[in-house]
Curated annotation (Swiss-Prot):
Oxygenase that can act as both a histone lysine demethylase and a ribosomal histidine hydroxylase. Specifically demethylates 'Lys-4' (H3K4me) and 'Lys-36' (H3K36me) of histone H3, thereby playing a central role in histone code. Residues 46-71, 82-98 have a biased composition (Acidic residues). GO terms for cellular component: nucleolus; nucleus. One of its GO terms (biological process) is negative regulation of DNA-templated transcription. This is Bifunctional lysine-specific demethylase and histidyl-hydroxylase NO66.
Amino acid sequence: MDPETLDDLVNELFDKKKQLTVSQKQQREKLQAYMMAQLEGSSSASDDDDEDDGEGEDDNDSNSDEDESGSESDATSADDSFSSDDNDDDDSGDEDGSDSGGSDSDLSFEDDSDYEDSHSTEDLTEYTINSENSSVEPTPPKRLKAGDKRPCSTQEEEESEDDNNNKPTARKLQMGESATNGRIQQRKSMVEPATTSKPASCPLTRKSLPANGSAAKSCPLPPKNQKQSAAAKSCPLPPKEKKLSSGAVAKSCPLPPKNEKPSSSGASCPLPSKTSKQVQPRVCQLSDKPKSSSSQSTQKRSKNEAAEGATDTNGRQEAHRQNSIEEGRRILSWVLNPIKPDDFFKDFWEKNACQVQRNAPTYFSELISFEMIDQMMLKHHLEFTTNIDVTSYKDGRRETLNPEGRAMPPTVWGFYGEGCSIRILNPSTYLPGLRTMCSLMQEFFHCLVGANVYLTPPNSQGFAPHFDDIEAFVLQVEGRKRWRLYMPLQPSDVLARESSGNYTPDQLGEPIFDEVLKPGDVLYFPRGTVHQAITEKKHHSLHITLSVYQQQAYANLLEKLMPMVLQSAIKHSVSLRRGLPLHTWQHLGIAHGATKCSSRSQLIKGIQEMVQQHLTPSENQIDAAVDQLAKRYQHEALPPTILPEEKLRTVFGSRSATDAHGKCLCDYELTEDTSIRLLRANILRLVVDETHLRVYYYVDNALEYCKYEANFMEIEPTEAAAVETLMHAYPAYVKISMLPLRKPERRIEVATALWERGLLMTETPFK
């Protein structure tokens, strides 16, 4: 058979009208070469063999039939396989176009170890989209056709005044597919950094399904450090009558005037600061490492100085000698700078609102940012309602729009792009810098310092006017937000113990404060102050609200105290146990309130005298009630952030090993000459619970609020004096031999037990 006949035979195996792909053409060429080899073999065999021609023809016919059928099956399978490959290529192209660089079931992170630390293998199995344990089939992401409209996909839409369109400027896309593909363009606007000096911080590699099962639009990140035209007045609120000078404290009613001006150098930052052209200090790093002239010298001396406890260039004591209460005060000073804490508590605390204005846009930028929120949602399992709220306030109506399930960036940013506010309820759980700040401040305030983060798109409001039951410190991180404060509507709302419901605009009077917060500014207002906030037309807002002194009033103390007093009085006073007079019902009660008679007057006077006589608390009862409030603090507090110098002196830096026989070898040993002190001033509390003497402590608390029961250890009454000695000596070190216990062995045992629980620190490292 000549090549032309063979070619005709090959063409018969394929549809002539079908347009062949490159892979099919290659397959046809392979088949053609195979048939040529078969023909050459059969022709040579016919020349050499002397067998019957008829048999040869029959054999050739059968072989030809077999080859033909085999070729058809090969061609069919090849066609299926290559068409499948083509489909896979198309799918992968769509994934790339819709911001995916991997398979649907894969997530990549910049640091896998960080993710492994926060998730167990079971967590990964549970939350993987394609998990075998999942009983719900994931809904495939909605694909838009080429002609469908996507946000910010055309030049005409980009130039239109969309208040919620905050795609960062100066981010140029490369020419090619990414320049025309709307899905790639949207993802690049989310992933690429705002400046070219830093690498991309978002490790997104695929488009995740929205938590509520519907396709949520992705929203580009808002611009950072966006410049505003001086002539533009985009705020939808009524114009202000006055301007506040930069660096001054607001003097709007009812704030008392302050003549104090910030110094030219500004207050020193409580955290080591980098060189900056700004006059005011900025947050750079939430740690207490000493400053160094170069990074090389810092690396060489870091371990030695951590062990020796070197003093930093600011003249502060080394970390292991610092008083945690004073450190918390120092952080508050930095937040309120240039107002001093003493002046703040004298003039503003629980009295008036206070605004601090700064020309320092990066003052709080190290605490949180848009990119940090994006990474936080990727690296940790945050749930709607539990960790994140989606809220809106439009036309006087407040709504919470939380879907169910995990909060992933595409879903959250989709809500944000639609004008919703995002509230993060416990960011300090996931952000070490913010957690360190709160853990230091809680030592000063002697109560939990909570933090919420609020992210609001331009020209939006997420919450209705209301008041809270906390002292609020608003730290403006990014963008601008206009705040209006109102006097409490009722006298009982002053220093309110519970938060209010939502107010309508017609219930409010004229605001006593109406100002715009800019990055670096701070606003304080007492609990019970009615407030509302709205972003300007062309500015988003990112701020932190620090909440302190929740349920920390005299009323809370009396709620603990008076039941104790009453129970003790009943136990020790027989007069309180006597029965009521028989005629009590006929003279007392609401129906007899207007009655004037001697019997009624005598009954009322006797009860009042009985209360004055028997229900006056003793010192011991007041102490016990305060201990109960302190016990609540031990349960609610954030765990302490252990600094390098402290780690070398605590159980957190201890490493155990085994010898050749498997015996455990510890690298520490406390003796009578070992000097010890408490890790923090309020790290523990000695409390009497009924008949038990317990030491409550918060060093082992979870990062989530009250996730576990309160931690405590029971001690003998004879050992309480040793704990009291450590509490009174703080922040000084005392030798174990100074503990008021009879036997040296017992002193060492008590000290070792406290040290092994992370409550004590030694003056000298064991290593």
